[in-house]
Curated annotation (Swiss-Prot):
This is Uncharacterized HTH-type transcriptional regulator PF1231. Gene3D superfamilies: 3.30.70.920, Winged helix-like DNA-binding domain superfamily/Winged helix DNA-binding domain. One of its GO terms (cellular component) is cytosol. PROSITE patterns: HTH_ASNC_2. Keywords: DNA-binding, Transcription, Transcription regulation. It comes from Pyrococcus furiosus (strain ATCC 43587 / DSM 3638 / JCM 8422 / Vc1). One of its GO terms (biological process) is response to amino acid. Residues 2-63 form the HTH asnC-type domain.
C-alpha cells in the first residue's frame, strides 16, 4: 500500500518524469536514497509501469488517432483482447462493459494505414464479430492516469 510519502513522490514524477531524485528529496525534505529506494520498490511492484515520453502524435507525423469499439464472440473476449494488445498500432486497450466488448485507441500515419489495420490485421483475428471506428478530429487533452 502507498503511504503519503510514496504518493508525494508519484505526484512529482507525474508532473515531470525527468525530475531528479535529489530534487524530489530536497522538496520533500528526505534523503535522496529514500526517494531512490521507494521508486525502485514502486517499479518492482508495478505501481510505476515505466518512464516514458508522452508525445503528441500529430506533431510526430501521425495523422490519425482513432477509437475502435470491438464486438466479440461470447467466451473469446480475453483471447481477442490479448491478440489486439500485441499490435503496434494499439496505444490503449481495455475490456469494457456496455454496448461493446473492447475499446482501443490506435495511432496511424494515414487513412490508408487505418484501412490496412482494420482489414488486414483486425480482419484476420478470429472471434471479432464487428467493429465501430471513430476518428478523433482534435484532441483537447493528452494525459495519463493521474492518481495523486
Amino acid at each position: 500500500m502507498l503511504d503519503e510519502l510514496d504518493k508525494r513522490i508519484l505526484y512529482f514524477l507525474q508532473e515531470d518524469g525527468r525530475r531528479s531524485y535529489s530534487e524530489i528529496a530536497r522538496i520533500l525534505g528526505v534523503p535522496e536514497s529514500t526517494v531512490r529506494v521507494r521508486v525502485k520498490k514502486m517499479l518492482k511492484n508495478g505501481i510505476i509501469r515505466k518512464f516514458a515520453a508522452l508525445i503528441n502524435p500529430f506533431k510526430a507525423g501521425y495523422e490519425i488517432v482513432a477509437v475502435i469499439a470491438v464486438d466479440v464472440e461470447p467466451n473469446k473476449v480475453r483471447e481477442v483482447a490479448e491478440k489486439l494488445a500485441e499490435l503496434n498500432e494499439v496505444d490503449v486497450l481495455g475490456i469494457a462493459t456496455g454496448a461493446h466488448d473492447i475499446f482501443m485507441q490506435v495511432t496511424v500515419k494515414s487513412l490508408r494505414e487505418l484501412e490496412e489495420f482494420l482489414l488486414d490485421k483486425l480482419g484476420k483475428i478470429e472471434g471479432i464479430k464487428s467493429t465501430e471506428t471513430s476518428i478523433l478530429t482534435s484532441v483537447k487533452k493528452w494525459g495519463y492516469a493521474r492518481v495523486f
